[in-house]
Amino acid sequence: MPSFLKFLFRLSFALMLIFWVPDNLHNTLTGNVTHLEGLWRQTDWVEQQMQIMTPEERIGQLFMVAAFSNKDDTHETAIRYLIENYHIGGMIFFQGTPLKQAELTNRYQAASKTPLLIAIDGEWGLGMRLENTLKFPKQLTLGAIQDNNLLYEMGVEIARQCRRVGIQMNMAPVIDVNNNANNPVIYDRSFGEDKYNVARKGIAYMEGMEANGVMACAKHFPGHGDTNSDSHYSLPVINHNIEHLKNIELYPFKELISKKVSGVMVAHLSIPALDNSIVKPPVTQTMPTTLSKKVVTDLLKKEMKYEGLVITDALNMKGVSEFFSPGILDVKALLAGNDILLYPENVGKAFDEIKNAIAKGEITQSEIDSRVRKILKAKYKVGLDKFEPIKTENLSNDLNTANAELLINKLYKSAITLVRNELQLIPFKQLEEKTIASLSIGATTMTDFQKKLNLYAKIEHHTLKASDTEKTFDQKYEDLKGFSHVIIGLHKLNNKASANYGIPPAAIALINKLKKTAQVTVVVFGSPYSLKNFEQLETLVVAYEDNKTTQLLSAQALFGAFSLQGKLPVSASPSFYYGKGENTTGSIRLEYSIPEDVGINARYLEPIDSIARKAIKDGATPGCQILVAKNGKVIYDKSFGYHTYGNDVPVHDSDIYDLASITKIAATALGLMEMYEKGKIELYDTLGKFLPELAGSNKAKLRIRDILIHEAGLEAFIPFYEKTLDPATRAQLYRTMRDTLFSIPVAQGLFLRKDYIDVIYETIKNSSLPHREYKYSDLGFFYFKKMLESYANTSLDQYLNERFYAHLGTNTLCFNPHDRFSKRRIVPSENDTKWRQQRVHGYVHDMGSAMLGGVCGHAGLFSNANDLAILMQMLLNKGHYGGERFFNQSTVELFTAYQNGNSRRGLIFDKPEPNSRYSNPASKLASFKTFGHTGFTGTCAWADPEHQLIYIFLSNRTYPKMSNNKLHSANIRTKIHDVIYQAMAKSKGV
């Protein structure tokens, strides 16, 4: 259209709008004008390109060649040759790296007269082809998801990543209906067997990409789901009639075509119902669909009214290449109606044969031009009219974002399917009643699945290789038959039905045998079709894929960290049918995620690492564990440094620290709160009511409440051990070997006379009450130990373990860890040269507690950060955790609240200091609802109900000398607490 006429037309249309358009239609028509303006501009650009291209250059636009970014310069030279001599229209990238691909794309685009359309075959994202990029779940996994909005979000994110690396088209989604369990090529690339589910999910994935600047390509038309062979190696045959094809295979394509999908890829299939012509004598097979005009033009373009890009499947695949030579094959694909020739074997031969076909009149130049215009319109649509070189700076970080990782986690979480839960075992509850073992079949070492299970319960772990002998499997039965529950993970499976998906007969026999002695839960990290092997199991989960993410999430799901909602996308048997899956409740235990999951940018938490490393470098502590949880999710859990300054043993997350005075809230408080709820104590009761031996002393009338808030007037502490340091006294009181008299272990190979406990209590009884106001004191907690043991009719440590810690599922919360754990897991607390004359390792650091055998109300408890966080989460939940109520909400609120204006204390619990004149043990940014405690060895635990936040810091700042006060003077614990609140504020995640 001449420019003058275009100007007049546009001016007339604008005047019409000004003088005629009603107000209520103005917005609608304005949008239409914008759309028309876009079409005009697109047409202008397309026609400009057509005018400057020669007929040969137009032919070149039909080719999309294969490119790699992991090959040498010879490959790049070959691609540049195709660009410069055959004017190819695009390329599809396969294996390589994102940086090299971006660099190559920039060079290729610069060398091309017409912008290149860059594609990738990335069904599950860039990670399907490129190293060091993220892999999204495969489509069969996605088929189990019930919320299709998540697939739209996935499409959005994959499009973002594609654009960042210079890709404009993704050859996805696969919308084949997988109604053949023996399909060797589609299988887990399909959303499943239900056409409606396939269509809905295909649309969601497609629209997410298309709305964000990347063209989708629906494949493999007219449907590759019901085949028994792979078109990469042969021509598969589908013998369904036309009614079946229209009802099943074609349905998803019809739906995506109605949603204007940009591309459709035609498969190499033999479908006599669609085209029964013989491919060529003497071959008896019917025409491959890619080369069939009846399929491509008559069915897809005319009957189904598809106007987008029609793309062949790769032309080097044996499904077509075995019938025709390069060049001839490409011409036949064009004659069938395809627009883009994908992965031609020989561009030069194809180019020449197409020219010959035009010259002979087999195909007209106008037909070529029509397809080229369609290709150019697509290029304009994705912004190639204004191509800008890809910026390679920070490319890896831009691709592999935390938000993308979070989305992948959400997808997998939503897919995991609880196929059977007949005994209502999942999520696991009442852990105190269970003895649990785990078995990974198909693994040689402890799996990520098993490691994550460790965070929820005490579990004994076992492994078996799939190749192990029947005898080895039988021996494993002997190891496991005594457990009440066995969790079995099936790993390294395959998709071959003929090989029973990689599950050995011995594994099935072992599972069936164990079922008779234990409650067995099987988690299949692989094909849902393999479920047919487990018809007799009551508890069965399928995670679809075997990777670190599915393993970590499956372990959390079993223990109720999040709800299970997935449904089977295919039928494995009449019992395990499409759509089957049980729903569970979630959020009953801690979940393990990333900061972005709770609205915090992980970058803002990075100063924690710097503070911790500097503290270690400055000699404030040899090492530490730091944990942050928000909204019931652990979002930061790291260990730093070593057990000692000798750098001999690095700190691991599972290592165990002496909690010191955190014992008050993590042990004694629990017992007293239970006694309070059961009416066994009142806050204004006196000690004398429970301890008649105090009659006549100044301790008898001390009120429980006053001791809890440190206002009973007691001395801060009494160094009982100092009276035993004299050599003569020491010889009378200690032995290096335990016997019936010297039975109190105060350190390794050092035992105190058991009757010396009476001396300790007598000393406390006769001590003065010098203080009339607030004074922090340990002494009352010696008496609380006696009270609780009398109440429970057992030792304090046994009571706490049986009533609380075992129920919570903690592994490391305990007194005297030297009895249960290897010293390599226990962090030493001091090199005591004064009293114990040894490294204090696995024994309580506090001298008073040590002289009571390591169990007391004020000190003696050990833990790692995770188990302490579990306990704090129970309190943050107002007394509820793991499906069990430990305390009434009112009890927790009473004990954790401020008690009066004399101090910042709650009942046992410490609180933020409201008076700015005094030092604050917690962050000044913490809400006044926050509660917790610090510990002498360099520990703290804080929970903030207002922000649903938990902060744990464990260290051994007392090693090698308890006089080291650098941790406190540098305010390390509080600085880290500050960073957490600052991160929430900066992220607006509060």
Language-model-detected regions and their locations in the chain:
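Second-shell residues forming the walls of enzyme active-site clefts
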Residues: T54, Q101-L116, L126-M128, E193-E367, ...
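Short acidic, glycine-rich surface-loop motifs adjacent to enzyme active sites
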Residues: Y81-P98, A181, I257-M287, H485-S498
